[in-house]
Swiss-Prot record:
Family per similarity comment: Belongs to the SEC2 family.
CDD domains according to UniProt: ATP-synt_Fo_b, Rab11BD_RAB3IP_like
Record's protein name: Rab guanine nucleotide exchange factor sec2
Keyword Protein transport: yes
Keywords of this entry: Coiled coil, Guanine-nucleotide releasing factor, Phosphoprotein, Protein transport, Transport, Virulence
Pfam family, one: Sec2p
Disruption phenotype annotation: Leads to slower growth and reduces the fungal burden and mortality of infected mice. Significlantly up-regulates the expression of atg1 and atg12 and accumulates more autophagosomes. Leads to down-regulation of CWI pathway genes including the chitin synthase genes chsB and chsC, the alpha-1,3-glucan synthase genes ags1 and ags3, the beta-1,3-glucan synthase gene fksA, and 1-3-beta-glucan glucosyltransferase gene gel1; but not chsA, chsG and gel2.
Lineage: Eukaryota, Fungi, Dikarya, Ascomycota, Pezizomycotina
Gene Ontology cellular component annotations, sorted alphabetically: cell tip
Gene behind the chain: sec2
Top-level taxon: Eukaryota
């Protein structure tokens, strides 16, 4: 170590002296006042009382602690000029002079320092000792301060623990007293706990009610959804079932129609082959017939000679003359339109009736499917349709618009009818023909077997196509019911009531018997209304004025048939009339016509009613509501003859009349109308029993076998 100068040594010495004097004074003060004395701090008497306050304690006003400066500032302090007035060295009331044995080195003045600086003495270990003592002193002071703080905190914790012990002891004593007094719980606590439990229970009930309400709502929604699901499923199943049944029913109907069509086609082919053989036989007598026709059709009046070159020869040029068999007397009377090869109908179209008729085409629905038949070819709609024979042997060929198809059991099936926007009975043309033709033909007002309440039902059923005509079973004919329209009661096969009609398809509907004359009246009326329904339903259409005229001529033909049915007669060609006088003796007797019926025909007549019935409860050539079977029954069957309802096109180039084919026990006529060039013409084949009545001079009927 380098030696300190004399001045510095003196200053350090003074500082140590002052520090030691201060320490001695501090210790003396604390020993006297018993403050922070080890003897007084640790061994404290048991009766010592302190404040229970846990907060920081304030110092007593009379206890002033003097803090000494750190030894780190000794050098700075030494450079300063100490002032004796700045520090009180007294401890309490005792002056500092009584305790200080050494002078405070910090109070050394500069003069003394200057004096001592001149001292030549040197203490090399004094500085290190002073530094060590200073460090120890500071450590002791810090330890003392830490111990004092810990002591104060411990005393406070002790006081708090003692207070807690006292409170717990008091509570324990109280609980023991309650237990000794059998007071296990307080009423206030019980009430408070019960109140809490009640509140919790109410809250639980409210929550449970909310949950139950939600549960019921969910269950109700689930039930509703389940019911709706099952209902929808049931609807779908029912709809699918109905659709399946409809499809199956339609398939069955289509199969039946296909089968019936095949059978009908086979029957047509067989009959066509037979007709071809008949035509070959008819060509043999063609030359004789041409000669007879030319001779018999020459008029005797001058006017007739003027008309002959203009009308009749031209018709003979365009159409083949009627071919007659050697027995020309068997041509029966009929409407003039039944001989299209001899007569051309000319109808006026500038009358109000024609305008009313044209209104039917305008009223027909535009949505109806087009008919394959031409407008006027009404007779060609029922090709090869054969009627059942009656008990008197009067079979009739159908010229109705029914497009019949024969099923395997002999019945006829037809498609469903198409409805129109306006009923037929509301049209002006129907009201006209009802008053002019239908009512005069039927004469329901004078019918003895029909009440005035039933007359309207009969007319409505004829108009709507629901009238059913069926043969009378042979077992019922013996009772001899009178005709419901004319009241005829005469016995015999010619006047026998062979058919009956009812106004609906119901089995419980009342049946009204018909004689031969009235049967033809009903059939002609029904056929006429059936053709009007075909027009109104759109199955017969007129694209131009020519087709409208053709349809008008067809209605005239049907109205003429009603006229001849109520008259009970018809027309025949003049050559047939001339030959009828020559062969009058060979005419069949009307009253003995039943003897002319063959064994096979008699078997058919003796058959039960089911053999005559069709699926529509025994329609006799179908009075039904179908598209093609709407029309009434057909065939011209009157007392004076059976007509052949031809419809020949005015443009036909070939029209041939069938040859009469005689059977062993009956007479049947097969008629063929064929056209080669006109696309509108339709081959029409009909079969009917031909009856010819001739009276001898003595008034008796003769039979021709």
């Amino acid at each position: 170590m380098c030696p300190l100068p004399h001045a510095n040594l003196s200053m350090v010495t003074n500082e140590v002296t002052n520090f030691m004097s201060s320490l001695i004074a501090f210790q003396t003060y604390h020993l006297r006042h018993s403050f922070l004395s080890p003897s007084n701090m640790i061994p404290r008497s048991s009766n010592h009382k302190r404040s229970l306050s846990s907060g920081p304690r304030s110092l007593s006003p009379d206890r002033t602690v003097t803090k000494t400066k750190s030894t780190n500032d000794l050098a700075a302090t030494a450079t300063e000029k100490p002032s004796l007035a700045t520090r009180s060295n007294s401890a309490g009331d005792i002056p500092d002079s009584g305790f200080s044995t050494l002078r405070d080195p910090r109070l050394v003045n500069n003069s003394e320092a200057s004096d001592t600086s001149s001292t030549p003495s040197h203490h090399p270990d004094l500085s290190s000792e002073v530094a060590a003592l200073s460090v120890k002193l500071i450590q002791a002071i810090n330890n003392q301060t830490t111990l004092d703080d810990n002591l104060v905190a411990t005393r406070q914790e002790l006081e708090q623990a003692q207070n807690r012990i006292k409170s717990l002891e008091s509570e324990n004593e109280k609980y023991r007293h309650d237990i000794e007094q059998a007071v296990l719980i307080k009423k206030a606590d019980a009430d408070r706990e019960i109140s809490q439990l009640k509140a919790a229970l109410a809250e639980e009930k409210a929550q449970r009610a909310i949950v139950e309400k939600s549960k019921k709502t969910i269950e109700q929604e689930l039930e509703t959804l389940t019911a709706a699901l099952f209902e929808e499923a049931n609807k779908m199943v029912a709809a699918a079932k109905l659709e399946r049944e409809a499809v199956e029913k339609k398939n069955e109907q289509l199969r039946a129609q296909v089968k019936d069509t095949e059978l009908l086609l086979a029957s047509h082919q067989e009959q066509l082959a037979e007709l071809k053989s008949v035509m070959q036989g008819m060509n043999i007598a063609k030359d004789d017939v041409e000669v007879r026709t030319t001779i018999s059709t020459v008029p005797s009046s001058p006017d007739g000679h003027q008309q002959l070159p203009g009308i009749f020869p031209r018709s003979l040029e365009t159409a083949d003359p009627p071919e007659q068999s050697p027995h020309v007397e068997e041509i029966v009377p009929g409407p003039s339109t039944s001989f299209p090869h001899l007569f051309k109908s000319v109808c006026r179209t500038d009358i109000q009736a024609f305008e009313d008729f044209r209104e039917l085409f305008s009223l027909s629905s535009a949505s109806k499917p087009p008919s394959r038949a031409a407008s006027g070819s009404y007779a060609g709609l029922n090709v090869m349709s054969l009627a059942n024979f009656s008990s008197a042997g009067f079979g009739s060929a159908s010229s109705s618009p029914a497009k019949s198809t024969h099923s395997p059991n002999g019945s006829m099936s037809s498609p469903q009818p198409a409805t129109s926007h306006i009923p037929l009975k509301e049209t002006r043309f129907y009201k006209r023909v009802l008053m002019e033709d239908i009512e005069p033909t039927l004469r329901l007002d004078a019918a003895p077997g029909i009440s005035w309440l039933t007359r309207r039902a009969v007319l409505s059923s004829i108009c709507e196509g629901s009238l059913v005509v069926e043969p009378i079973p042979p077992a019922t004919r013996k009772y001899g019911f009178p005709c419901s329209l004319c009241g005829d009661r005469r016995p015999g096969s010619a006047n026998e009531r062979t058919h009956r009609f009812r106004t609906s398809d119901s089995d419980t509907a009342q049946r009204y018997p018909l004689c031969v004359l009235c049967l033809e009246k009903v059939r002609s009326s029904c056929e006429f209304t059936g053709y009007l329904r075909l027009i109104l339903d759109g199955h017969v259409r007129a694209a131009d004025a020519e087709e409208e005229k053709d349809a008008w001529e067809e209605t005239v033909r049907l109205r003429e048939r009603m006229f001849w049915s109520r008259i009970g007669g018809g027309v025949v060609p003049t050559f047939a009339q001339a030959n009828s006088f020559e062969n009058a003796g060979s005419a069949p007797s009307r009253h003995n016509l039943g003897d002319r019926i063959g064994d096979d025909e008699q078997d058919r007549l003796d058959a039960p009613l089911e053999t005559y019935e069709t699926p529509n409860h025994g329609h006799d050539h179908g009075v039904s509501d179908s598209d093609y079977d709407n029309a009434s029954v057909s065939g011209y069957t009157s007392a004076s003859g059976v007509s052949r309802p031809f419809y020949g096109s005015p443009k036909s180039h070939a029209s041939e009349k069938g040859k009469d084919e005689y059977l062993e026990h009956g007479v049947s006529q097969v008629t063929l109308s064929a056209t080669s060039d006109d696309p509108k013409s339709i081959t029409h084949v009909e079969e009917s029993l031909v009856i010819r009545t001739a009276k001898n001079d003595d008034g008796h009927d003769d039979d021709q076998n």
